[in-house]
Amino acid sequence: MLFAALRDMQWRKRRLVITIISTGLIFGMTLVLTGLANGFRVEARHTVDSMGVDVFVVRSGAAGPFLGSIPFPDVDLARVAAEPGVMAAAPLGSVGTIMKEGTSTRNVTVFGAPEHGPGMPRVSEGRSPSKPDEVAASSTMGRHLGDTVEVGARRLRVVGIVPNSTALAKIPNVFLTTEGLQKLAYNGQPNITSIGIIGMPRQLPEGYQTFDRVGAVNDLVRPLKVAVNSISIVAVLLWIVAVLIVGSVVYLSALERLRDFAVFKAIGTPTRSIMAGLALQALVIALLAAVVGVVLAQVLAPLFPMIVAVPVGAYLALPVAAIVIGLFASVAGLKRVVTVDPAQAFGGP
């Protein structure tokens, strides 16, 4: 029966090719959507890792060192730096603002850190900012060394380029000295949003708590939670569409082969063998569509303006999902096979 199923697929190859390509496009888009949702976390992790900070110390009650931070004076910096387990400590700041580009504006995320860190990422061109009116800009902004940019209400000179530094769905990051950020965001008041630590403090002064890198990443992606959930809903809908496409083709094939199934039953072929042949068709379609989907995902990903980072687990899970979809999609056709009367084999045309 399996051979008969494969021969039937060969006979209907044009229909199967169209089905495989259509389902493959669905699989490819699902992978891309998965990569988009994961890309938000990948870019946030890249930003946090580039700072070289092991632990962020924030005020108690803060939701994170960046977007969920509570600004506080840096009066306890020396006490935190002197705690056992702390190798280095630096005052850090973070604020969202706008940058003017001619007559238009764009959002940027501003980070403040000492020139030599921790908290200041490595630059691919130029040097790290050392003065309040200097800035290291993300390479995604298209700026060059020596350019002047207007961030918030301040005009800053670009002295360094940080490679591909973005967060919050490709919003570029810019890095100032801590003093520069304080002038930009707090009118020069010595406020910070966190203390970046290299090492692991054994205890902290009262009124403070810590976030590790994972917690810092979660803080950066928190505003994107609704977007990620929306993407997940669309991905689920695409899986349903894939089931409907494969299921409709298998069901039509079953309807067209009712006389064949009746003949098979009349000559004593077990129903389970007939059902296995029909299920095989659905599995072959789904697995070939999965291969097409992987290829299409690689082609489509660079076309998106945001980071598409498809996790390895998604590629590994796709064949399994394809098998499940194939089996689920074949249910309607299998039910039709069970109800076929062998007497139809002896009926008229």
From Swiss-Prot:
The keyword Ribonucleoprotein does not apply. GO terms for cellular component: extracellular region; plasma membrane. Residues 124-134 have a biased composition (Basic and acidic residues). Keywords: Cell membrane, Membrane, Transmembrane, Transmembrane helix, Transport. It comes from the Bacteria. It is found in: Cell membrane. The chain crosses the membrane at residues 16-36, 231-251, 284-304, 307-327. It is a multi-pass membrane protein. Its main location: membrane. The keyword Ribosomal protein does not apply. It holds the Pfam family FtsX. Residues 111-139 are annotated as: Disordered. Probably part of an ABC transporter complex. Probably responsible for the translocation of the substrate across the membrane. Belongs to the ABC-4 integral membrane protein family. The complex is composed of two ATP-binding proteins (Rv0073), two transmembrane proteins (Rv0072) and a solute-binding protein. This is Uncharacterized ABC transporter permease Rv0072.
